[in-house]
Amino acid sequence: MKIHEYQGKQILKKFGVTVPRGIHCTTVEDAVKAAETLGGKVWVVKAQIHAGGRGKGGGVKVATSLEKVREYAGQILGMQLVTHQTGPEGQKVRHLLIEEGADIKHEYYVAALTDRATQSVAIMASYEGGMDIEEVAHKTPEKIVKVFVNPLVGLTDEQALTLAKGMGMNEASIPQCIETLKSLYTCYMETDASLAEINPLIHEGDGTVKALDAKFNFDSNALYRQPEIVAMRDLDEEDPDEVEASQFDLAYISLDGNIGCLVNGAGLAMATMDTIKLFGAEPANFLDVGGGATTEKVTEAFKIMLKNPKVKGILVNIFGGIMKCDTIAEGVVAAAKLTHLSVPLVVRMKGTNEDLGKKILKDSGLPIISADSMAEAATKIVAAVK
């Protein structure tokens, strides 16, 4: 789960990280009032969407007058903001953050994240802030310093000092930087985040260390114990089909292809998508119905897939372990009838009650194409949609 920058800064502030004063707005008039309330001579008008690269896309503007605040707020609110993370369609801007200006002397990068390679929490820092860390890692990896944290001990002063010096932090700002890094780690752990990123972290002319941006990803499996985080969820920022799928406990992700996929198990789902691509087509989605699929879940899965006008065919690939093939077959038949299925449907199933499942499909009277292997299934659905 993701949240907006202004929400992320609220969380950081709660854990002791210094952030600029800012006010969340949803209208142009509120933006102007926010600037008046903040005072000063410089304000930053920032689009709030769940994507990075907002500045390059025109979603972050520095205003030096209230008239400019009004102008920029009017330009940004309601725009389709396109960044390298949104795709070509962009995301509609519904929220703004009006923030006081900062006396930036240098921009750094810091993040706490789950490092899958070492199965531990890593704290990363770099002198090269304010830009894509992936680009820094690719071109100048020596500019990134990383430490791994023992969760029984936490981020130590020694580790935080190593990070602060390794990232080239201004000498006078190192003590506050150490506290900021320790607060970031505590925040990451206590909110069940999988990523807590500040890019940029700055030091000002007087040495103050501030977080000028905040990006969080949270572990969806831990949200049951994070009600305050759940309350920050903005469904307008999420794919409506993915939101609907989550209500039926379906793991669904929209893609750009034309072959819908319904599979049980994430690994098999990824292998199915790879096989479709191998045979020259593109999957329209990732869809894992899990091990406890019911007729209702399968029907909803079909409905969600068929909402996508790009879907020209559906491939169902099931391994019957806990999930029995006959249960899936009954769900597929019911779903095909309820949705008045009009695109080719290929079903491949192996495992528990496989023969019974195939009989249910055959006796349904529906034009369902059967396959015995994943390669055969992919071949048949690719041929059917051409």
UniProtKB/Swiss-Prot annotation:
ATP binds at K46, G53, R54, G55, E99, A102, E107. GO terms for cellular component: cytosol; succinate-CoA ligase complex. The keyword Ligase applies. Disulfide bonds: none annotated. Binds 1 Mg(2+) ion per subunit. It catalyses: succinate + ATP + CoA = succinyl-CoA + ADP + phosphate; GTP + succinate + CoA = succinyl-CoA + GDP + phosphate. SUPFAM superfamilies: Glutathione synthetase ATP-binding domain-like, Succinyl-CoA synthetase domains. It is an enzyme of class 6 (ligase). One of its GO terms (molecular function) is succinate-CoA ligase (GDP-forming) activity. Pathway: Carbohydrate metabolism; tricarboxylic acid cycle; succinate from succinyl-CoA (ligase route): step 1/1. InterPro entries: ATP-grasp, ATP-grasp_succ-CoA_synth-type, ATP_grasp_subdomain_1, Succ-CoA_synthase_bsu_CS, SUCC_ACL_C, Succ_CoA_ligase-like_bsu, Succinyl-CoA_synth-like. Its EC number is 6.2.1.5. Substrate binds at N264, G321, I322, M323. GO terms for biological process: succinyl-CoA metabolic process; tricarboxylic acid cycle. Its cofactor is Mg(2+). The keyword Metal-binding applies. Mg(2+) binds at N199, D213. Keywords: ATP-binding, Ligase, Magnesium, Metal-binding, Nucleotide-binding, Tricarboxylic acid cycle. Succinyl-CoA synthetase functions in the citric acid cycle (TCA), coupling the hydrolysis of succinyl-CoA to the synthesis of either ATP or GTP and thus represents the only step of substrate-level phosphorylation in the TCA. The beta subunit provides nucleotide specificity of the enzyme and binds the substrate succinate, while the binding sites for coenzyme A and phosphate are found in the alpha subunit. Belongs to the succinate/malate CoA ligase beta subunit family. Heterotetramer of two alpha and two beta subunits. This is Succinate--CoA ligase [ADP-forming] subunit beta. It comes from Dechloromonas aromatica (strain RCB).
